Amino acid sequence: MPDYRRIAAELGRTPESTVFSIEDSDYDSGGWASFIAIRLACRGAEPEIRDGYQVTRYASVVICRIAPLAALMKVVEAGVALDGKGSFSKLPVADDLVSAVPWDTRQRIPEILANYGYQILAPEIGRLRLPDGLGVDTLLTSKDEKDCYIGHHVFDAWFHWMD
């Protein structure tokens, strides 16, 4: 298994980005999803205080745990309550796929991911719908049943599969 912290550290050393957080994506369920989200903020950008929250704008580099695949997500916001009693963020979804992080003007992110053997999922591929009834064997199903991806996207199959 790759050392995601090393990838995050290298992404954070680019001139344009700093690592905001690394999320293991367990959906608060005790299980693990099949991705790691490395949240990148634009270097030099300050968090904003708004409505009792410290709000940070970030873009995610989402790394698949089950295949050498990564995805780039659009800029969104996460916040932590100033009193420490709450937070908010956004789960990566297919509609948020982008081909580049806006402040990565030198295109270092794809280069770093390629050095670790990851290919970036193109947004137009990630947004394709899977055929209804497509079944996938998982550890969560018996040998006679399959998890079905009804109405899901290619992105969902690679990055939201519960392992």
For every predicted segment, state its role:
Residues 113-163:
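Acidic, proline/glycine-rich low-complexity IDRs
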Residues 1-126:
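Extended, charge-biased low-complexity segments
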